[in-house]
Each structure stands twice: as C-alpha cells, then as structure tokens.
Amino acid sequence: DNGLKIVDGHGNVLGEAYEHACEMICNAKTEAQLENALDCFEEKLPFLETSREDAKKTAVVYFGRDTRESGERLVEKAKEGARALGGRSSGVAVKICDRGVVTTPMLHYFVYAHGKAVEAFYENNKQQEEKNDEDATERSLWEKIDAATQELAYFKRLAVGYLSLIEEDEEKKKKGKNVVEGLRANATTLPPLHIDCANGVGFVAFEKLMALFDVIRENSSSSENSRRSATTTTTTTTTKEIALVLKNGPNDGPVNLNCGSDFVQKNQRAPETPSTRLSFVNQRCASVDGDCDRLVYFSIEEGEEEGKEGENSSKKQNFMLCDGDKLSILIAFFLIEQLFLAGLAHKISLGIAHTAYSNGAFTKFCEKNGVETVCAKTGVKNVHKAAEEHFDIGVYFESNGHGTALFSDEAVKVIEKELVDELTRMSVEQHLRKEEEKHIQSVILTTKLKALLTLKATIQTINPAIGDAISSVLLIEGILRKKGNMPFQEWHAMYRDLPTKQTKVKVRDRTVIECFDSERKCLKPEGLQQRIDEILLLDSCVKNNNRRAFVRPSGTEDIVRVYVEASDAETCEKISTKVEEAVIEFCN
C-alpha cells in the first residue's frame, strides 16, 4: 500500500541519470551486479564538503513519510540501506535527517534549503574561514542547515509570503480598480475554502500551517499550543487571513480512495467518502492528492430542476472544475499584470509550459491574449524543465494540478534590484519636490512599489523546489483576494473547456508506437498518424479546428493512451472509437 519517492541532491525530481542507476539496483540479480549498480549510483552522488582540505565528506540523506502505517517501518529499512551504502565508501560519513510525517513537497524543500544554507554559509564566511577553528566552523554550518531544514522554516516561509501578498491596501479597499473590485474589496475575506485532503498527509500539514498564522501575528516562537490532532473528519480553521474547512483526514479511509484531486479531475465529481459526500455542495472547494503536490479547485451548484416544486423535487447539480490549465491562467495573468505595473514587462519574460493534455480552449485562450506557451512531453519533470529553459518566469501545471511558477535566479535579482532602486527614488523625490507635486508623484511610485512588493511576496509564497499543493492554495487564495475576492464562477468562466475523452487500448507491445512534437504526433507505426488525421476530418465539409486526437504509449504497461477533443461530446465519442480501432489495427 506504499511506495518510494526519491529527491535529487538539489531538491528537484530525480534526473534520468539517477533513474537509470536506480533501475540497475532494483534489477540486480547477483551480488556482482548489485555492486556494479551501487558503484554507478555512487559516482553520481553529491557530497557535502565539511572541511577546506576535503579530507572529510558527508552524505546527508533526508527522510520523510506520510500517514500510512507502513511508512515508519519502510523508513527504518531505507535508513539501513543508506548507512550500508556509506559503509562501503571509505572516508564518507552518513548523516540521517528524519523529518517524520511530511508532504512530498516538504521533503523536496528540505533538500533545497539544505543546499542554499551551505551556499550562504560559505559565502558569508569567505574572509573568516582562515581564522576560524575547523571544528567550530563545521558545528556552525550544521546549526545553519538544521534551522533551515525544519518544518517550521518551511511553514514560516509560506505563511509570511502569503501574509505579505494579501496585506491590505486601504486605497484599493475604498476605490478598487473598478466599481466591482471596489465593492468586493470591502469584504473581509473570501468565503471558506472546503479542502478535500484525500485521507492523507495534507490534512496534517494544513493544520500546522493554519496554527502558525496566529503565531506569526503574535510574534511567538512556537505554535504547538494552537495545533489540533489531525484525526477528525472535518476541521474548520478561520483566521483573519484565510478560512479553510479541512475534510478527509488520515483516519477517514485509505489514501486517495474515492477522493483526492485525481479522482475529482478525472471523474468530474466531488469526493465520495461517506462522511463528506454531501458537504461540498454550494461551497468553494479544492482537492489535493495523497502526496499533497497536486491541486484542483471545484464547485457544485445545486438547485431544483426547472418545472418541479415541493419536497420530492429532484436536484440538478452543476459541477465546475478549475484544473491545472486554469490554475496556470490565473497565476500567469496575475504575474503579467504585476510585471507591467512594476515596469519590468520588457526585462522579464513570462510564459506557460503545458502538455498535450491541456485543453484546446486553454491554448487558444492563451494565444488570443498574447501569452506565450510551450508544449512539453507528458510528465512533471518535462514540463518543469520546459518552463525553466524557455522563460524567466515559467508557469506550469499539468492538467491534474501538479505544477508551480518558477522564478529564475536572474528574474529574482532584477525584481530585488528594482525594488531597492524604487525605494531610493521615492526617498529622493520626496525631499526634492514641492508638497503639491510630491503627492502626484508618490501615487505613481506607490503603484510601482506595490507591484514590486507583490512580486517579492509571490516568490516567497511559492515552494521554490517543486509543485506544492499547500503553496498553490496560498498563492491562488492570495491572487483571488488581490483581485477583489474574485468569485469562483468568474474564474471558471474565463474560457469554456472543450469536451474530451481519454481511453486505454491494450496492445502486445507498446514500444511499436513512437511519438514526436511533444507526443502530439505519431511517427511509428507508419500510417497511423495519417489515419488519425483522416478520422478527424470525417463528417466535416471543412476542417474543424476544435477536433484533436493523439495517441501515446504508457510508460509502465503495454497499453496505448488515446486522447480525443471535439466541439461536442457525441463527436468526441465517435472519434475516440475510430482512433481506438486504428490503434488496434496498426499495433497488433
């Protein structure tokens, strides 16, 4: 009932070189093969140099687990493996850092923060390193690392970033950018967000985060007294900053069973856990997955069916989903606006990375509004890489809600420099200008300054290592508040998704299919792509630009995945059936 996720030495997803080494270890059948695989793995490991002479090296291994009972036993076995690996390498010490029950993105963050703490330590000690005692220097280094890689440091980063992002703007509260935003801004906060935590560790993490908000306000050093046990079905947490209703905790059933973001996104309906089945209706809702790295928003509006009255009248439900595509749109458009207000639109490039599974309505909406996009192969590591390589600020979310916004180091430097320059200019202007002129100039400068501060707060609200559902909830809630408590319905209505259908076809050998153009086109077997193109033109006098279909092999089993998109569900069904038949004909 459990599995293993491995984080690379920088806090990112595991690279292909590591994947190959891990496969060699798992598939080793003899002791000689295992030794060879371990040698291959060791060659790729980054070690922490803990002395100037490089006489000592330490392999640091971070561990975390979710709320499943088997987790504790598996972690202990993994620790044994880490120590054994260190024992076969002379001069290498193994330091175990067990962070207990954490989300997957939290573990990514700890590894990321470890590296940043080491970089900062040696940068700050360049001049004093010659004079310092070596043992004292090493102790000081580990103190810095330990402080940076605790869960309190993680939660504090996100909480402080969010509080900075939503800091009240009294001028906007009174006037707003327009009448609608002005009226919305008078509300203290958004309506409560009901979060389906997939019976997983996200429930525990959200409770700890919420407890910290009050602690930060009180400038206290510990949040233990305000934490609650994460075992109940529902927990309601309301503060001045945010209102969350947490549902589906660790004791409510197996992780992801009939709940979680994957269930909601694929089935287009609310979680079906017995205790919470009806409680999502007419609410603002979100769903995370068991690892707490994916996020989708949804809403279910319920009312009486037209023409029926009385107690026995049936209810008609309208399910609305904001998946990864709409998360990308909201975040990207918000950041574009802030870059424009900050005067940085010409200095910092911004775009969206997506996969072939993104809805065609999404890509057309981006094109219509001048937002640059790039399509990558399926898989979060591929989309992450595309966002990183193509843009200074790359926003990416797979359709399932796994993603984030990546700020390059250069983009962060530009924003920070512009912020310092703007503060300096404001100070000079206020001393040089006359009183009546100063007021006019300060309004212009304040608009720019607020945008720069908003960008800085956004950076801090985001987990810099990987897509993180907790970070994403805070960012989305912050953006909706900054946009005058924007209603879910308005966000959802930015564009209308085209009907889609996804199916699987069993084949003898999935490797006969080769794809290109980010898996949107089929190269082999020869003739299959031509047949798909012909199917898309069936029953149509002219080419229908809303029709789209592609096939790709599964990465783990002998099946071919089929994706079809069309203007209506009936056409979608018809095309899907014909494409499936073509796959069977060409692949078997």
Predicted regions and their residues:
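Short alpha-helix plus adjacent loop in nuclease-associated cores
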Residues: 102-115
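An N-terminal, well-structured beta->alpha segment
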Residues: 1-81, 86-92, 114-132, 140-193, ...
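Short, highly selective alpha-helical patches that border small-molecule cofactor pockets
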Residues: 71, 75, 79, 203-206, ...
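Phosphate-binding chemistry for phosphorylated carbohydrates and sugar-nucleotides
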Residues: 84, 101-102, 147-483
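Catalytic-core signal marking the mid-to-C-terminal active-site face
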Residues: 435-461, 479-588
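Conserved phosphate-binding/catalytic loops in two-lobed NTP-binding clefts
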Residues: 90-104, 251
